[in-house]
Amino acid sequence: HLSAEAFAHPLDLIPTLFHELQRPCVLVIDEFLFLEDLQLAHAFHELGKRVMTWPFALFLLTSSSPYRAKMILRERLHLLFGQFEVLSMPSVDPRAAMTWIRETCPSAIRMPSVAEFLLQWIGPSPWYLSVFLRRIQELARLSRAHRSEETIWLRAAWDLVGNPDGPLYHWCLTRVEQAVHQRAGVAARDVLLAMAHGARTSQAIVEKLGTRRNLSEALQVLVEHDLVERKGTCWIIPDQLLATWLLGVLGPRERYGSLDHTAAQRAFEQALTEEWAAWRTIMNRSLSQRLETLLNQFRNETVSLDSKTGRLPAFAALRTQRLDHADVTYLVADGEGRRWCCAVAESRPDENAITAFQAFCAAQQPKPVRKVVVTRLPMDLNAKLLAKACNMWVWESEDL
């Protein structure tokens, strides 16, 4: 009951502060959805009553689970008490996050590739980054053998994510268990594991599981708990760290049963090392090679891209054409009577490059149904507007 008392205490304190100081108050509740886990009857109802009757207090509620947060606000708070406004805050800019990594761990992360992979893997989440960087600093200070940066961050990942005593291990476990304890929970866990192993569509999930039973209910549970997102007909796990935990921790445990410490660490490090190796392979390839690999993975899925919904056809043939006078490569993909034309720019394309690509597409037979511009660097605003006016999709290297 201590947690419930700790929550009730500041609620009781706010009116006293206001009457004594005659100043408005602000109450910030981070991850407010966890109020349900306190041993406090009708936590949201108690909170809502105070929101309604305390005009002198501003309540700021935050959550990293947007779907559930909006549902709670809409169904339990706003409907009864009103006065709630929902704001979606963007995450930390990746460039700012990279600067943070370099400034926080100059001695622990000397290899730029390690820092880049860390950011790509866990995303620009301030909490994930702060926990990781703190542990990397500790290991760097404790290491007298001058272990490599790769070894240090791999050990930090195990300590935080793979080890049952790690804080991020418990975070991932809690998120999955919340879904598993709901309706169709066992099916939801199996579907989540199938997606972590690469199943992107409902059909691919069925092929991995061997059954369609409770699939719709399981997917809905996962969406409600912000574990998966739907992009057209494709399903993704947006939290890459959680996906690694599923591959390296929950997957081996479901497959082999209880594992000793050494076997569990080996399974986790193998999963993470494979991700690291795959990422390094991709990053060492040219942008046009990465795009070609991506196009070869299309299997007639319908997805949401560039704020539009479209089908990704299975291509039968791809050919490239490099321009002599510019740092641009054209790639033409054909499949099922549908042609895509892509312009891959290793530098920043200007308006002339967009105009030239438009002329190239206009000369094609058959006419392309999709025109895509892929750039390594962000495009100039005028060039991007021209590309949009020509009905082109604009992708950056991170999209690949």
Task: Name each model feature, range by range.
Residues P66-F84:
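Short regulatory helix/loop adjacent to the ATP-binding pocket of P-loop NTPases
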Residues V372-L400:
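Domain-level recognition of nuclease-like catalytic cores that cleave nucleotide substrates
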